[in-house]
From Swiss-Prot:
Pfam families attached to this UniProt entry: bPH_1
Protein's recorded name: Uncharacterized protein YjqA
Gene behind this protein: yjqA
CDD domains with a match to the protein in the record: PH-like_bacteria
Top-rank taxon: Bacteria
Amino acid sequence: MGFIDGLLGNASTLSTAAVQEELAHILLEGEKVEAAFKLVRDLIVFTDKRLILVDKQGITGKKTEFQSIPYKSISRFSVETAGRFDLDSELKIWISGAELPAVSKQFKKDESIYDIQKVLAAVCM
């Protein structure tokens, strides 16, 4: 996956070492990045303790929101794959006590949503 895939919304796998360094200022001491995916400018990061969603905002991307979700708080998740005429896949994550999904991410038609689902299943089950 390359630059064009990123622009089109296809998630690409990132180096865990690079993400570990980039997020060092918000990671706990000893916390380790297990897997990371990039979606345009946003990141979906799985550590050994939590899920971190990084939302880079604005034209320059300097304004950044870090959403931290402990794995124990994830009550369920769903993956809706793209169909023949529907070009988008969608990942939804619910947290304990919430009726609506706390997270909803759109993906273009590609296989990376399956990789993200596998990691999410491994850490939540």
